[in-house]
Amino acid sequence: MDRIIEKLDHGWWIVSHEQKLWLPRGELPYGEATNFDLVGQRALLIGEWEGEPVWLVLQHRRHDMGSVRQVIDQDVGLFQLAGRGVQLAEFYRSHKFCGYCGHPMYPSKTEWAMLCSHCRERYYPQIAPCIIVAIRRADSILLAQHTRHRNGVHTVLAGFVEVGETLEQAVAREVMEESGIKVKNLRYVTSQPWPFPQSLMTAFMAEYDSGEIVIDPKELLEAGWYRYDDLPLLPPPGTVARRLIEDTVAMCRAEYE
């Protein structure tokens, strides 16, 4: 699936190492390979964006290595491809040796996988399923400031799905653990790949059922009910969290205006 980059190759270049992304001038590099000193490197074709190929190069650059979060404000499709590249780069870096027998592994030529040269075990990139849920109570939405968001951003609740747990059970558990309330009328909305580090966000909307807000201080700085027309600082557009909030606001406007 990979090949040597030639002079005439062009497109979008995802140059990644250790979950970092090369962002010269703060942007994903686009153009001919010669412009970015990539000729002769090995590249993996991981997709297409606006008719142009998207290449993954497993390489560290001395300067301008940043987080994929820095391209979150770009088009959602391009952000997702950048996230795919970072996740694949980390997968290949962390699977050089077989976890069963310890022998070297090599990449598959037909799919995104690593194969053991000794016991023939096959490894695929792991994806961690997560839930994210917007909870509505009349004309208000539950928003929280997470301990990892020290910039004042308030968002909806989210968390990882545990082993042996359904998505619906994960929603109920995470909401109770983080906020102390119960929800009802759960409805699936959409999903979004989320490369922090290798998640798949499954998005839901729910209605408040019962309970008073009691936050988990290990997870949240604060949480509260916010009227739909008086909201705090929100996650950026293009994120599934923002989509859930905007959908909830639209429902409130339709009912209360």
Swiss-Prot record:
Superkingdom of source: Bacteria
E.C. no: 3.6.1.-, 3.6.1.22
UniProt binding sites for substrate: R69, E111, Y124, Q192, P193, W194, P195, F196, P197, Q198, S199, A241
Record key words, sorted: Hydrolase, Magnesium, Manganese, Metal-binding, NAD, Zinc
Enzyme class: hydrolase
Required cofactor(s): Mg(2+); Mn(2+); Zn(2+)
Binding site for a divalent metal cation 3: E174, E178, E219
Any one GO molecular function term: manganese ion binding
Keyword Cell cycle in record: no
Cofactor binding: number and manner: Divalent metal cations. Mg(2+) or Mn(2+).
Similarity section: Belongs to the Nudix hydrolase family. NudC subfamily.
HAMAP family recorded: Nudix_NudC
PANTHER family: NAD-CAPPED RNA HYDROLASE NUDT12, NUDIX HYDROLASE, NUDC SUBFAMILY
Protein name: NAD-capped RNA hydrolase NudC
Gene: nudC
